[in-house]
Curated annotation (Swiss-Prot):
One family name in Pfam for this protein: NHL
Keyword Repeat assigned: yes
Positions annotated as NHL repeat: 48-91, 93-132
Keyword Cell inner membrane: no
Keywords assigned by UniProt, alphabetized: Repeat
Protein name according to UniProt: NHL-repeat-containing protein 4
PANTHER family, per the entry: E3 UBIQUITIN-PROTEIN LIGASE TRIM32 (PTHR25464:SF3), TRIPARTITE MOTIF-CONTAINING PROTEIN 2-LIKE PROTEIN (PTHR25464)
Length: 136
């Protein structure tokens, strides 16, 4: 037996997405969805659309993949095509995190003490980076 049956909380459709690929937690109880065609859509805790990171910040993505948010409410996006990870703080411009050795970043998660765990499909491995507290 695998466990209890999972049922949807509410039958909700997020319309207007173009090739949704990855879903991750967003700030304030919301979530973020990366789209196959080059943007990341943000949704609030009541599932209401908040806009796209590209439109809100002027950032151009190659192929956004994994998304997550950190303890400070920043959204972090892996860009598979550009081989980079970008941090979108609550206030201010996007910051390209200088993470050495990324070949094809896909999934990621924020870990305790300001660490970022990245699944790098180009190297077939998981990479751990320290990013909070290390930026000047």
């Amino acid at each position: 037996m695998l466990g209890p049956t999972w049922e949807p909380l509410a039958p909700t459709s997020m319309l207007g997405l173009e090739g949704p690929c990855w879903v991750g937690p967003g700030p304030d109880g919301g979530f973020a969805v990366s789209e196959e065609f080059g943007d990341v859509q943000l949704f609030g805790s009541a599932h209401q659309p908040l806009g796209s990171l590209g439109t809100l910040t002027g950032h151009n993505f190659g192929h956004p993949a994994g998304v997550c948010s950190d303890a400070e409410g920043s959204i972090i996006v892996a860009d598979e095509q550009r081989h980079q990870v970008t941090l979108f703080p609550r206030v201010g411009p996007p910051i390209c995190l200088q993470l050495e050795g990324l070949k094809r970043p896909l999934g990621m998660a924020c870990a305790p003490q300001g660490q970022l765990v990245v699944a790098d499909a180009g190297d077939n491995c998981i990479k751990l980076y320290q990013y909070l507290g290390e930026m000047a």
